[in-house]
């Protein structure tokens, strides 16, 4: 039986190993995208000086709208509980576009743009740099990533059976990484012990990641948790359309798929072009006039909030909680007077409204805060190294088994 698992482990690793390395390494690079971006562009994400009180939200939104072309409008604002963080203002287009404004001075600090490096890593992680076919053809990059990830699951499981020690002493020795007995011993220990230490994290990342690759897998995965899904429309859809009886899945703002993304409501266009009041000119009230009223109501009712997002007619509250990092309480309000008319709390949602956020949180390691993110980062790096160390050990073994007479001899001059 061990020989069977050894063959499975070997012959799946040889063709898919390098792809697994690329997927794991690019995934590791995305874990701390937000922190790296904020460190490199602090002036964009943080205010220069915290004042006694921010400017009225209506004034801030009007300032941002004045900088936009006529074809783009303000659709919402995300307010952090951290007074040093600038307000994030979401825009109607392009997709997931946003700008940042200093809430104390009204200065627009800039527009969010994903760094080319992280965009490259994201496309590598999801599609091996392939692009969706406009004619509806096969999305090869997505399929190859999904197939490689599925094979990785079998490689990991078979590796456990190959590794499984026969005695307690062997178990203890097999979980040590020895660095002073030669390179071959070091790479062997890193491959074996590193794989076992990161097994749970790697399996969790692989099993959740497959939900983005295959509809059949996503359907089965969701059914395991008692959730029915509708077939995804088109290629590259990042998540399934869960049939949520208790509101939209996860209760999260829309437009937050993938690694390292920023939140942002995509509410209806509040007014005419550029987010400016249209129709009867000055006689029409600003579409943003009640946003601050809604924000203040929600902030007072939820003192432990992480972020409050407000758009035209809807709002959401996110918290610093263990578990699903996309869990939000969602609200609807009357845009004419700011009265909250409906509340959908995350705790009241059925599984169909929570599973997508849980899948994402487990996949990127954010479910347990900074600790699990660090562990996920380390696990992904080790996962990227496993095929490389495996290739090294396999080649060394092949060379060692080669008959002496067939090995290349140095040519004497």
Can you annotate each of these PLM segments?
Residues 1-413:
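Conserved histidines in hydrophobic membrane contexts and catalytic metal-binding motifs
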């Amino acid at each position: 039986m061990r020989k069977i698992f050894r063959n499975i482990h070997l012959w799946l690793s040889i063709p898919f190993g390098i792809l697994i390395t690329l997927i794991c390494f690019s995934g590791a690079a995305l874990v701390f995208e937000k922190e790296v971006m904020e460190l490199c562009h602090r002036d964009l994400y943080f205010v220069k000086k915290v004042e006694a009180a921010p400017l009225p939200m209506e004034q801030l939104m009007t300032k941002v709208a004045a900088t936009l072309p006529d074809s783009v409008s303000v659709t919402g604002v995300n307010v952090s509980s951290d007074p040093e963080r600038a307000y994030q203002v979401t825009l109607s287009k392009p997709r997931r576009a946003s700008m940042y404004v200093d809430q104390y001075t009204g200065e627009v600090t800039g527009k969010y743009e994903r760094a080319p490096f992280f965009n490259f890593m994201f496309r590598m992680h999801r599609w091996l740099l392939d692009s969706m076919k406009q004619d509806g053809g096969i999305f090869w990059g997505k399929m190859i990533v999904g197939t490689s990830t599925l094979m990785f699951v079998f490689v990991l499981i078979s590796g456990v059976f190959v590794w499984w020690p026969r005695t307690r002493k062997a178990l203890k020795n097999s979980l040590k990484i020895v660095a002073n007995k030669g390179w071959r011993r070091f790479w062997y220990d890193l491959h074996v012990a590193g794989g076992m230490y990161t097994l749970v994290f790697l399996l969790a990342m692989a099993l959740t990641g497959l939900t983005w690759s295959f509809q059949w897998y996503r359907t089965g995965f969701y059914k395991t948790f008692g959730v029915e899904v509708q077939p995804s429309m088109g290629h590259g859809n990042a998540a399934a359309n869960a049939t949520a009886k208790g509101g939209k899945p996860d209760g999260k703002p829309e437009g937050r798929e993938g690694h390292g993304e920023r939140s942002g409501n995509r509410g209806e266009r509040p007014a005419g072009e550029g987010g400016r009041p249209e129709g009867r000119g000055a006689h029409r009230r600003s579409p943003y006039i009640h946003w601050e009223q809604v924000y203040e109501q929600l902030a007072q009712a939820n003192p432990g909030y992480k972020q409050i997002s407000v758009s035209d007619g809807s709002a959401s509250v996110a918290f610093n909680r263990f578990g699903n990092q996309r869990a939000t309480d969602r609200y609807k309000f009357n845009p004419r007077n700011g009265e909250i008319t409906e509340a959908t709390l995350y705790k009241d949602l059925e599984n169909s409204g929570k599973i997508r956020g849980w899948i994402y949180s487990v996949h990127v390691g954010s479910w347990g805060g900074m600790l699990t993110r660090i562990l996920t980062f380390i696990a992904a790096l080790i996962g990227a190294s496993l095929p490389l160390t495996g290739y090294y050990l396999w080649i060394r073994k092949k060379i060692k088994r080669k008959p002496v007479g067939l090995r290349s001899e140095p040519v004497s001059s």
